[in-house]
């Protein structure tokens, strides 16, 4: 379970302020006080009755037998008195724990104050266009670190007080030495059973599920604690297949992500590689939008930093399709331009070529264009600063679509290259919002995945944070199945390794899991290559494949995902070649469907470096 010393103040303060508080402990103390009073009264009454019978004026008990009975009754009176003292001690220690809690709560930072600090930090970062907020950002972070330290110090004090109170409690079985000798065997049996049950409860890890390694998990196959979900490696995740902590979603690698398939920290979105992104498919940090490659971009498909608009290449551009720095407008190539389709620097106008020009130079400043506002060459469309584009607002080259800062994309808002789809900052993907490379699917930040929401590599399925899995929500590696936190399992909910079945926290002996596999380190069915290793799924040959019936080249690794691929590093269905993503492509380094040649995107293209369709 995650220790409080590594948890941020949002978690520690929230638990202390929004939990049950000291009320239940004070109620327990009152109950122990009541029990102590009742036991004390019973002990006093029992002693008075016994002494009255034995030594009263009437001498109700006489003879040797009566004397023996008086002697036998004395330990019971002593037991009642000792039990009353133990109950009173428990009440005192319960009050001490409640007092320690109240002292810690008073020393904790109010969650409202923590939230205000984080909100101010985000606002400062988003508005830090020219770096003017750097001192304020540093001050906010310093204050946040002080909050973290204050919360940890308060929790250390609480832990010390509670531990001291627990240590002061005397075990109940030592309250009356020798009492068990006075009881018959029938009475001893329930006591022994209760003691065994108590020991069993103490050893119980309190998981609601199977195959967990850790405590307080609500789910199965987790390695860690306080997860609500299955197949997580880490703590306090709300979802499945995460590798890390405090994630709200599935298939994340990192901490505090609210979404799926992220690699990094605190991303509210999916398929991001980096931290603090509000959107999907970004590579970088603190972007508000999707498909950006860089930092602090406000829009989509930018390649650079602090751009306000889409499809820009460069920094500090306001508009779309610009290639350069500090341009205000659309389709400019250069820096400091204000307007449309200018080539050069510090121009104000439309279609100007050169530096410091003011006016209207033409529909386009480039050559061979059909359209308006193009500063590049051989474009068909509007406001393209790159070359050979069909569409608008493209700052890259050879794109079919709009808002692409990368090259040879078919789609829109792609900052990477050779993508078929939209919102991808990675390269060679088929789908949407992929931050990784050569994926066939969506929201993947890893590479060579077939599916969606994978932050690992070479998976066939979805929400896998590990590598080379066939299935879903696996945080481990080379699993065939679902919700596995361990490695090389065939089945589900396994926190251990090399299991064939469900819900095991153990590591089994053997080279492979599953059925009919040869080689080493394989899971699934019928992976029959004697020299193969690291395969998951069904009927694969080679190394590192996931999915169904993939074949790597002889004596070389495969690392394919999907179905019936031949070659290496392919993702999708029936591809033949290398680094292909999609369906039925042949050649190398292409994405899409039924392309032949190399470095193509789209569908039904034959050649080199083509985007679009039927070219």
Swiss-Prot record:
| Record-linked Gene3D superfamilies | PPE superfamily
SUPFAM superfamilies, A to Z: PE/PPE dimer-like
Superkingdom, taxonomy of origin: Bacteria
Q: Which GO terms describe its biological process?
A: response to host immune response
**What InterPro entries does the entry give?**
Mycobac_pentapep, PPE_dom, PPE_sf
Q: PANTHER family per the record?
A: GLUTAMINE-RICH PROTEIN 2
Q: Which family does it belong to?
A: Belongs to the mycobacterial PPE family.
Question: By what name is this protein known?
Answer: Uncharacterized PPE family protein PPE40
């Amino acid at each position: 379970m995650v220790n409080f010393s590594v948890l941020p103040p949002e978690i520690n303060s929230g638990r202390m302020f929004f939990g049950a508080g000291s009320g239940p402990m004070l109620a327990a103390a009152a109950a122990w006080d009541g029990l102590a009073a009742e036991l004390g009264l019973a002990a006093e009454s029992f002693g008075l009755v016994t002494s009255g019978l034995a030594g009263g004026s009437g001498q109700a008990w006489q003879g040797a037998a009566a004397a023996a009975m008086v002697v036998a009754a004395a330990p019971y009176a002593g037991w009642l008195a000792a039990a009353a003292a133990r109950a009173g001690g428990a009440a005192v220690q319960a009050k001490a724990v409640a007092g320690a809690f109240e002292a810690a709560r008073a020393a904790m930072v109010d969650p409202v104050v923590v939230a205000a600090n984080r909100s101010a930090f985000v606002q400062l970062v988003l508005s830090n266009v020219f770096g003017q907020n750097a001192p304020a950002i540093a001050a906010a972070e310093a204050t946040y670190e002080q909050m973290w330290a204050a919360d940890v110090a308060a929790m250390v004090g609480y832990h010390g007080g509670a531990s001291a109170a627990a240590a002061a409690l005397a075990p109940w079985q030592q309250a009356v030495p020798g009492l068990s000798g006075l009881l018959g065997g029938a009475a001893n049996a329930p006591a022994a059973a209760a003691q065994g049950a108590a020991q069993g409860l103490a050893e119980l890890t309190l998981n609601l599920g199977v195959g967990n390694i850790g405590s307080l998990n609500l789910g199965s196959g987790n390695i860690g604690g306080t997860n609500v979900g299955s197949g997580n490696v880490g703590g306090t995740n709300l979802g499945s297949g995460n590798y890390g902590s405090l994630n709200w979603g599935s298939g994340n690698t990192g901490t505090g992500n609210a979404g799926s398939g992220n690699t990094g920290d605190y991303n509210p979105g999916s398929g991001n590689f980096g931290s603090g992104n509000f959107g999907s498919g970004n590579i970088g940090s603190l972007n508000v939008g999707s498909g950006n490659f860089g930092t602090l971009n406000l829009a989509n498909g930018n390649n650079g930093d602090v751009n306000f608009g889409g499809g820009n290449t460069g920094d500090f551009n306001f508009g779309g399709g610009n290639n350069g720095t500090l341009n205000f407008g659309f389709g400019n190539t250069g820096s400091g331009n204000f307007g449309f389709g200018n080539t050069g620097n510090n121009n104000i106008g439309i279609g100007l070529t050169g530096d410091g020009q003011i006016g209207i130079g033409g529909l386009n400043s480039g050559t061979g264009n059909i359209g308006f506002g193009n500063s590049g060459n051989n474009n068909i469309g509007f406001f393209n600063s790159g070359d050979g584009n069909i569409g608008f607002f493209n700052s890259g080259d050879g794109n079919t679509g709009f808002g692409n800062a990368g090259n040879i994309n078919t789609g829109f808002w792609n900052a990477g290259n050779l993508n078929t789809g939209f919102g991808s900052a990675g390269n060679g993907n088929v789908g949407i919002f992929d931050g990784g490379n050569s994926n066939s699917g969506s929201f993947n930040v890893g590479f060579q995945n077939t599916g969606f929401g994978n932050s690992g590599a070479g998976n066939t399925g979805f929400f896998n944070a590990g590598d080379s899995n066939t299935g879903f929500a696996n945080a481990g590696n080379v699993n065939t199945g679902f919700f596995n936190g361990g490695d090389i399992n065939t089945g589900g909910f396994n926190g251990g390794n090399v299991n064939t079945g469900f819900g095991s926290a153990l590591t089994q002996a053997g080279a492979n899991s599953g059925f009919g596999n040869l080689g080493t380190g394989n899971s699934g069915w019928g992976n029959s290559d004697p020299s193969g290793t690291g395969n998951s799924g069904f009927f694969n040959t080679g190394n590192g494949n996931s999915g169904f019936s993939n074949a790597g080249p002889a004596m070389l690794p495969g690392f394919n995902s999907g179905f019936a691929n031949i070659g290496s590093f392919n993702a999708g269905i029936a591809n033949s070649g290398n680094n292909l993503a999609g369906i039925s492509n042949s050649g190398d380094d292409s994405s899409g469907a039924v392309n032949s040649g190399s470095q193509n995107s789209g569908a039904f293209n034959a050649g080199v470096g083509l985007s679009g369709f039927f070219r």
